[in-house]
From Swiss-Prot:
Catalytic reaction(s) noted: Hydrolysis of terminal, non-reducing beta-D-mannose residues in beta-D-mannosides
Phylogenetic classification of the source organism: Eukaryota, Fungi, Dikarya, Ascomycota, Pezizomycotina
Leftover remarks: In contrast to clade A beta-mannosidases, which are likely secreted, clade B proteins appear to be intracellular.
Active site: E432 (proton donor)
The protein's name in its UniProt record: Beta-mannosidase B
Pathway given in the UniProt record: Glycan metabolism; N-glycan degradation
InterPro entries on file: Beta-gal/glucu_dom_sf, Beta-mannosidase-like_N2, Beta-mannosidase_GH2, Galactose-bd-like_sf, Glyco_hydro_2_Ig-like, Glycoside_hydrolase_SF, Ig-like_fold, Mannosidase_ig
Annotated glycan sites: N252, N717, N723
EC numbers on record: 3.2.1.25
Top-rank taxon: Eukaryota
């Protein structure tokens, strides 16, 4: 017997181009996991592909094959034990050879692979491990040619990508480069053991009154020899053991223990309670000797997707522990094109930003990867709900028998790997594949329920989303809701706003509607929508090396924006709304204002609709992050620098948010007439679970003078509806013949004497306003070792006051509207005494 030992094979690797034959061609690999682009850079064979036009200089890598090699000593293996070579991820077509003998062939990036090498390592001394990585780009093209009858309809990247189980964004997307990586992208190690815990998971039954829970822990055991193994289960909370139980392992290698938990501490998304995590541990024992120990954290909670008929159609919203949750959040793409470079610390910083921005859900998009454990651990610990796509995106995938088998293994592996995470509340079959079906005119008869028929149509991928994947989720994570696609709703068109989720791209893409009416364009759950903006100047300084290229329409800036038609779309939204500028810094700022306003108009209205029989169940903006330094829809750039939209969204997602908006008049139509009157509305949105009392004030302030143009409106002792919307004014009227000068509507709400939220509605568009000479004052009123407080005041209304984003500095608020008589405080952490003050900019400055 032997206790499980692990020997990571992270050092001592070398690699070379497969076409090279000389020994001199081998180059050292600093550390594994890695991909070839990282290793080429480390050997000065490749420039940073994220800078300038270097992506083009890296294109040769995409069509190459590579070999990785290491030499290792056979680990000591006591009698009765085995030696296993374990790969957590190989990217992608990999032939693994041990001492010249092929022991494994891999064609799926998303699968872990294990090979028993006990006999292969019988000889003492050195052993040579080689991995040949074939070119995925060329293999995909070969596979496509083998099936010319399949309709290879797709958006983004070469359509041949659909034949390969590799991160689809590697073929390039409308926000990322074409970087076809290859390599040992997750850990590789040797394991020596006589028996091991192959899997540990829990199933939780929470009583309806939440006063008790039943936790059943399951274990699967692999052993070299059958025998009297015992599983010692322990249940802990905050490091303190609650209970334990010892169970004999059955002949088929399973054991389970059931624990009754009284008055359990529930797992909640942040803002609703503590994200409490229990820990279950199992010690595998034989003859009083511990052979292997595994621990996993889990949460006690319920999670449902509520779909029920109502006056708007059919609802789609999330309920956790019996509480309806408005899921304001973001979509997530891989945080780097070179995946092994993402550290656990970097993952956690991203999720901390989500919490700082009051976002409660993150959608792991289907064109990337099933994320690293540290991503989900951070979501568990910080209370962020996860919408998890399976890795299919924007295409009509083929369904060859061997590909279906690979997909089944991939889905089983990843559902089993991730099922203990309480943050994951939904599995979704794909991203926009049903939209591809619609646009390509592929066959989809929702009434045909025979899966074998689906395989015979020109849209065979339906079999994956409506049979294979739901069966896997039902078998391995039966308590998690499954949704066939995003967007999708009961087989109706994907743009149907009455059912399921929808991707609303008629702002930016599509009909390019005015962002001021975004709230009228939504559906039951808006799982994608967005607006592009430039990143901050410091990010552009990173990838634009030549000062002469730092102007808005430069070649290199266009190259770093992969969105089709971005020039026309950015220009359209800028010229419709703002006084444009030709200098780069102002141009950056103006695009950020447009993005912030777009997100605000969408989120604000959709959150208000939550209170109307859950008309809108949530909004996940496209997108939170970037995979390289670029110009995109991200609200936080590659270097974790928030754009103004990040703060605009955070304010709208405040637990208590006041909203005010006037009727939108479109000045761009033919023969537009100035309105004589405009309607306005005032409301409060609350995610609090109890009714509260508040005082709401609405002021009407001249843009030109800062003075009140009419008597303010005050609602005292207002009863704020719990977890919903309280409409205070639905038929307000502005008489432009009486109050002709442009003015803002400035709303505030106090609860228990504390000012908790603000909103300012402006005359649209901004380009018609004179925003000069604001009388803004930003004054430091306190300072400590790493924190400063600023007091901001103004004589006239100020639009979108944005502070500089600096490395290691966190700002409590930015992209703020400031009005006279309402001084605001901003806390800055990480700025030390003597540091230069943060620069700031506002509209019209």
């Amino acid at each position: 017997m032997s206790k499980l030992q692990q020997f990571p094979l992270s050092k001592g690797w070398s690699f070379r181009d497969n076409e090279a034959t000389s020994e001199d061609a081998w180059m050292p690999v600093p550390v594994v996991p890695s991909v070839v682009h990282q290793d080429l850079q480390a050997n000065n064979k490749l420039k940073d592909p994220y800078i300038g036009f270097n992506e083009l200089e890296a294109r040769w890598v995409n069509e190459k094959s590579w070999t990785y090699k290491t030499v290792f000593q056979k680990p000591a293996a006591p009698a009765g034990s085995c030696i296993v070579l374990a790969f957590d991820g190989l990217d992608t077509f990999a032939k693994v050879k041990l001492d010249g003998n092929v022991i494994l062939e891999n064609d799926n990036m998303f699968l872990a692979r294990r090979v028993d090498v006990t006999k292969a390592l019988e000889a003492e001394g050195d052993h040579v491990l080689e991995i040949d990585f074939d070119c995925a780009f060329l293999r995909a093209k070969e596979l496509r040619k083998q099936d010319p009858r399949h309709n290879w309809a797709s958006f983004n990247g070469d359509p041949s990508r659909l034949s390969v189980r590799k991160a689809q964004y590697h073929w390039g997307w409308d926000w990322g480069p074409v970087l076809m990586t290859a390599g040992i992208w997750r850990e590789v190690r040797l394991e020596v053991y006589s028996a091991r815990v192959a899997d540990l998971w829990t199933e939780v039954q929470l009583a309806s009154d939440h006063q008790s829970a039943q936790v059943t822990a399951f274990v699967e055991v692999e052993s070299v020899h059958s025998g009297s193994h015992r599983a010692c289960f322990t249940l802990s909370l905050h490091g303190q053991e609650i209970t334990r139980e010892e169970i004999g392992v059955t002949e088929n290698g399973t054991a389970k223990a059931t624990f009754d938990v009284k008055e359990p501490s529930l797992w909640w998304p942040h803002g609703y309670g503590d994200a409490t995590l229990y820990e279950v541990s199992v010690s595998l024992v034989k003859e009083q000797e511990e052979l292997h120990r595994v621990s996993k954290k889990f949460g006690i909670r319920t999670a449902e997707v509520i779909q029920r008929p109502d006056k708007h159609g059919k609802s789609f919203f999330f309920r956790v522990n019996g509480v309806d949750i408005f899921c304001g959040g973001s979509c997530w793409i891989p945080a780097d094109n070179l995946l092994p470079s993402i550290t656990a610390e970097r993952y956690r910083k991203w999720i901390e930003l989500m919490v700082h921005g009051r976002q409660v859900m993150i959608r792991v998009w289907g064109g990337g990867i099933y994320e690293d454990y540290s991503f989900y651990d951070a979501c568990d610990e910080l209370g962020v709900l996860v919408w998890q796509d399976f890795m299919f995106g924007c295409g009509n995938y083929p369904t060859w028998p061997n590909l279906l088998e690979s997909i089944r293994k991939e889905s089983v592996y990843n559902v089993r790997r991730l099922r203990h995470h309480p943050s994951i509340v939904i599995w979704v079959g794909n991203n926009e594949d049903y939209q591809v079906q619609e646009q390509a005119g592929l066959t989809y008869n929702y009434e045909d329920k025979d899966p074998e028929n689906w395989l015979k149509t020109d849209f065979p991928a339906r079999y994956i989303y409506e049979k294979l994947l739901p069966e896997v989720v039902q078998e391995y994570s039966p308590g998690t809701f499954y949704h066939p696609g995003s967007p999708w709703g009961d087989g109706k068109t994907t743009s149907d706003p009455t059912v399921g989720d929808m991707h609303q791209w008629n702002v930016w893409h599509g009909t390019q509607e005015k962002y001021q009416i975004f709230d009228t364009l939504g559906g039951r759950f808006n799982s994608e929508f967005g607006m592009e903006a430039f990143p901050h100047m410091s990010t552009i300084d990173y990838f634009v090396e030549n000062e002469a290229d730092k102007y808005p329409q430069s070649h290199v800036l266009d190259f770093h924006n992969k969105a089709d038609g971005h020039e026309r779309r950015i220009a359209t939204y800028l010229v419709e709304n703002l006084r444009t500028a030709t200098d780069l810094e102002t141009h950056i700022y103006l695009t950020q204002v447009v993005q912030a306003e777009t997100m605000m108009f969408g989120y604000r209205g959709w959150r208000r609709q939550w209170g109307d029989e859950r008309h809108c169940g949530g909004a996940l903006l496209w997108q939170l992050n970037d995979c390289w330094p670029t110009i995109s829809w991200a609200i936080v750039d590659y270097f974790l620098r928030p754009k103004p939209a990040f703060y605009a969204v955070a304010r709208v997602l405040n637990p208590i948010a006041v909203g005010v908006r006037r009727e939108h008049h479109d000045w761009s139509v033919t023969h537009a007439q100035p309105p004589k009157t405009s309607k306005f509305e005032l409301w409060v949105a609350s995610s609090r679970q109890q009714e509260i009392q508040g005082t709401v004030e609405l002021r009407f302030l001249s843009v030109n003078t800062g003075l009140e143009v009419r008597e303010r409106i005050v609602h005292e002792n207002v009863s704020i509806v719990p977890n919903g919307t309280t409409n205070l004014i639905v038929d307000g009227l502005i008489d432009h013949t009486v109050h002709s000068e442009p003015h803002v509507l400035a709303a505030r709400i106090w609860v228990d004497g504390q000012l908790v939220a603000r909103d300012v509605d402006w005359p649209q568009p901004f380009k018609y306003l004179d925003l000069s000479d604001r009388g803004l004052e930003v004054k430091k009123i306190s300072e400590s070792e790493d924190e400063q407080t600023l007091l901001i005041s103004t004589k006239k209304p100020v639009k979108c006051l944005v502070f500089e984003e600096r490395e290691g500095v966190r700002i409590s608020d930015s992209a703020m509207d400031i009005v006279p008589g309402d001084d605001q405080r901003v806390t800055i952490k990480g700025l030390k005494p003597g540091d230069a003050p943060l620069k700031y900019k506002f509209l019209g400055q």
